[in-house]
Amino acid sequence: MFKENDVVVAREDHPDKQIIAGQIGTVICCFTVPNKAYEVEFIDESGKPVAQFALLPDELEAYDL
């Protein structure tokens, strides 16, 4: 579904990580074991990294330019 360096959007809030739905991130690693998941780095409006954590495919959507 996604590959490394794809720009993605969080589909839901992750308050424990200070991420809100609609926040933009970049896939930095793809996992297949034990489940398909993606390590995503999220940034703020100025481009500063905010959080990095793994998400399941249904928690992300592609960012449309």
Regions from the PLM with identified roles:
Residues 2-64:
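Basic/aromatic-rich interaction segments and small domains that mediate binding to polyanionic partners
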